């Protein structure tokens, strides 16, 4: 009887382990429908996305997770901006052609540009990294990136991404330091 009880107990534990492992497995990220409940959720999403983007790139084209995330925080207000919510555009990436999906800025509907719409938020991350790797305005960034991956050192070389210049660098550094202090990414 005691042996039977031990066998039954082992079977129950095995079944419990199997069923709980199914329910505890991470759900795959649905890149298309993601909205963010809080800053931590935003950071986890961004970390998963940039990991996916960087693993497909040669070493010299990879971009620091912290820079990609901090820029998205600044440009999309933690993923809550209209462009992020309606257009999956975390970086305010503009277009001057109206051939593809795009959005007009509400405050300037007569602008000669529009903001790109992406299928997924992660697609906007891919495009941001592509811009950093190819646009002439970011040549200095690419040169310095070969020397270090330190986000705080590289942040000043992204000042051309915004019309704010040096002020943008200060904000970017501030966001990087805030994330380092409050979150583990």
State each model region's role:
Residues 22-70, 74-185:
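Catalytic cores of secreted/periplasmic lytic hydrolases that degrade extracellular macromolecules
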Residues 2-12:
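Bacterial N-terminal signal peptides that target proteins for export
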